């Protein structure tokens, strides 16, 4: 089978427009504390701040107001998420928290040492699934102007966090360390729509705390175990001793009750992407490729009913689910790294295809972006339906085995039949909405689907390829006159 390079393919197909999301801070970007924001900076001389042994008041906000995400550090290893602000403390505001499968397992995780909260110095992404926070403290009574302790926190999307205290003091420090925890076990959809749940009451559980609600249970365990655990305040407490230059660490693990650790799809031998390296005069090309593949691996999900089929999710952090057009475009762009993602995406979407009589037969349903009862679902199926035969045809060119192509060919034929039926005797494919506009990008998708779909039909002895090419040529001829606008 001839191999074609993506660079030689016409670029008349563009990824579909996704929801407007706030930009996410990229890994490696240092963050300085902001003076216009309460980030736990010391409020008393000597760096003294509020202790976390008292539950902080809920931050007031307008009901239904969408929480901001433009400054958040978002760690992704689906189905796990960890969303943090720059200071590293989880305060229960907005989207902050640790999530699994769309449920917030931990919304509050505030560290204090000897009653003081660390002063934020740096926050950055270190991988797609991890963020690192650095802060400083002045804890010794006779400390000078320089901090005598550095606090490092590394938070992962799988629900683990490691906190390390490093002393630069010249004498031994004996200090209480407190971590205040809390959660509402709310669904991400409710939180994203500005309606989080009330904070739940904790109970002491093993080496940590546990929360329960009608929808589930979550627990946090600590290693080493705390000296004291106070359920009423949601507080874990240690009494530590640090010699000069010494360090102390604790690891927190957040889990759904009864669930094991998150097993991500794209790690190690399970990755659908073949090893690749970038050869370029640009020094950053290799790092860019590596980072891009890692980001894609973090967004991989399995079809729950067919675990061998994988696809890419879209919509982080607001929702992390299957958006057909986005998944098909992304799978097409990764064809140089293998066809496993493409075939998994196609199989998953083929199982959702609408069948039976009616004008919608053959459609690949769009993303049902259901955020619970608060935000209505939206469904845009046209682009996904047009992209399905395109991806199948191009995956075949990139070496998808013939038996797998033949398995998916009936679904591609139904997509093309929907296109023929919807266009009818006309020249263009109209918008899915009644009396909707004729979008130029939709015509680009339809033109490519007709041409590559015709190649598929011809290759497997199906009829209809000639008619698809004739219609594509008619549309191409008429398009400049109908869509071109002169200044």
Regions found by a protein language model. Name each.
Residues 300-317, 355-374, 420-435, 481-487:
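Glycine- and aromatic-rich loop/turn segments at beta-sheet edges
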Residues 320-426, 440-443, 447:
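Aromatic-rich carbohydrate-recognition surfaces in CAZymes
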Residues 1-293, 309-310, 316-326, 332-340, ...:
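Terminal accessory carbohydrate-recognition/targeting modules of carbohydrate-active enzymes
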Residues 209, 392-395, 450-453, 457:
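The core hydrophobic/aromatic register in alpha-helical repeat solenoids, strongest
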Residues 127, 180-183, 257, 347-352, ...:
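Amphipathic alpha-helical scaffolding segments
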């Amino acid at each position: 089978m001839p191999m074609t390079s993506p660079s030689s393919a016409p670029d008349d197909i563009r990824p579909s427009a996704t929801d407007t999301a706030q930009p996410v801070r990229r890994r490696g970007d240092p963050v300085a504390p902001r003076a216009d924001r309460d980030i736990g900076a010391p409020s008393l001389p000597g760096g003294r701040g509020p202790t976390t042994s008292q539950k902080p008041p809920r931050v007031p906000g307008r009901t239904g107001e969408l929480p901001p995400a433009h400054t958040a550090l978002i760690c992704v290893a689906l189905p796990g998420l960890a969303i943090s602000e720059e200071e590293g403390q989880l305060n229960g505001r907005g989207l902050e928290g640790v999530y699994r499968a769309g449920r917030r397992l931990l919304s509050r995780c505030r560290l204090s040492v000897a009653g003081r909260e660390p002063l934020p110095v740096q926050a950055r992404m270190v991988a797609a699934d991890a963020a690192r926070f650095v802060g400083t403290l002045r804890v010794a009574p006779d400390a000078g102007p320089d901090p005598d302790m550095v606090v490092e926190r590394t938070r992962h999307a799988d629900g683990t966090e490691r906190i390390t205290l490093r002393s630069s003091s010249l004498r031994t420090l004996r200090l209480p360390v407190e971590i205040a925890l809390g959660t509402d076990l709310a669904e991400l959809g409710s939180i994203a729509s500005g309606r989080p749940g009330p904070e739940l009451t904790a109970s002491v559980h093993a080496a940590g705390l546990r929360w329960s609600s009608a929808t589930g249970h979550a627990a946090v365990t600590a290693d080493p175990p705390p000296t004291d655990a106070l359920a009423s305040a949601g507080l874990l407490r240690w009494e530590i001793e640090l010699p000069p230059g010494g360090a102390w660490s604790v690891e927190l693990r957040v889990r759904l009750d009864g669930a094991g650790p998150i097993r991500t799809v794209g790690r190690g031998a399970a990755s659908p992407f073949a090893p690749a390296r970038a050869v370029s005069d640009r020094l950053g090309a290799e790092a860019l490729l590596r980072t891009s593949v890692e980001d894609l691996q973090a967004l991989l999900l399995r079809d729950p009913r067919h675990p061998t089929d994988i696809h890419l999710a879209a919509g982080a952090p607001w929702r992390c689910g299957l958006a057909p057009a986005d998944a098909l475009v992304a799978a097409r762009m990764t064809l140089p790294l293998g066809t496993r993602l493409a075939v998994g995406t196609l199989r998953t979407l083929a199982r959702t295809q609408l069948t039976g009589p009616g004008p919608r037969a053959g459609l690949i349903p769009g993303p049902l972006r259901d955020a619970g009862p608060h935000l209505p679902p939206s469904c845009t199926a046209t682009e996904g339906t047009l992209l399905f035969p395109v991806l199948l045809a191009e995956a075949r060119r990139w070496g998808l085995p013939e038996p797998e192509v033949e398995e998916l060919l009936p679904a591609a034929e139904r997509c093309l039949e929907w296109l023929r039926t919807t266009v009818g005797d006309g020249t263009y494919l109209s918008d899915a909405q009644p009396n909707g506009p004729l979008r130029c990008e939709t015509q680009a998708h339809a033109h490519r689907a007709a041409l590559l779909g015709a190649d598929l039909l011809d290759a497997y002895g199906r009829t209809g390829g000639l008619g698809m090419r004739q219609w594509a040529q008619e549309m191409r001829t008429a398009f400049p006159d109908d869509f071109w606008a002169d200044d």
